[in-house]
């Protein structure tokens, strides 16, 4: 049995066009290169885009591990959406990568970019997409039993 992992995230945004250009740069930089479009109705059902179902969602897919389907993030348009304090964090391989990412985030159009107050203890960059969705890049260290320590 595999450890549980997330399959997908449905993230509501006020406007897909408001954030799409940002995620078109960010997600491929993470290696999430496959993109698709969909229509999500009021009941949350997903449909292919057609004359009856106009595009109101964009999805970015991570590469498959060859065993399970690829996970994805779907940005779904909801004009009444208010941003929340929820944050999605993506893991980097090392704290040195954070230094490389900071200017890239600015180039992509990220807002409110801040370094962790404790870059040694918790190396991370906090930022927002153009709609105010809170995101994070972190490079947590392996400690405790995972690192062979008591």
Which residues fall in each region the model found?
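Vicinal oxygen chelate
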Residues: 2, 6-14, 78-150
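N-terminal beta-strand motif that seeds the catalytic metal site of vicinal oxygen chelate
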Residues: 1-20, 31, 87-88, 143-150
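Class I S-adenosyl-L-methionine
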Residues: 24, 28, 99-102, 106
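Core segments of cupin and vicinal oxygen chelate
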Residues: 10-67
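Acetyl-CoA-dependent GNAT
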Residues: 75-79, 139-142
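A short, structured beta-strand/loop element
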Residues: 70-74
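Alpha-helical elements of the RecA-like P-loop NTPase motor core of helicases
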Residues: 20-21, 99, 135
């Amino acid at each position: 049995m595999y450890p549980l992992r997330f399959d997908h995230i449905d993230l509501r945004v006020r406007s897909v066009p408001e954030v799409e250009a940002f995620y078109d740069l960010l997600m491929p930089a993470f290696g999430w290169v496959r993109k698709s479009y969909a229509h999500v109705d009021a009941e949350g059902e997903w449909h292919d885009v057609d004359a009856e179902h106009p595009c109101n969602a964009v999805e970015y897919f991570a590469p498959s591990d060859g065993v399970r389907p690829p996970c994805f993030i779907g940005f779904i348009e909801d004009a009444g959406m208010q941003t929340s304090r929820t944050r999605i964090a993506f893991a980097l391989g090392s704290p040195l990568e954070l230094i490389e990412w900071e200017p890239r985030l600015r180039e992509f159009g990220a807002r409110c970019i801040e370094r962790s107050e404790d870059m040694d203890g918790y190396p991370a960059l906090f930022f927002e997409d153009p709609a105010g969705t809170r995101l994070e890049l972190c490079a947590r260290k392996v400690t405790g039993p995972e690192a062979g320590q008591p």
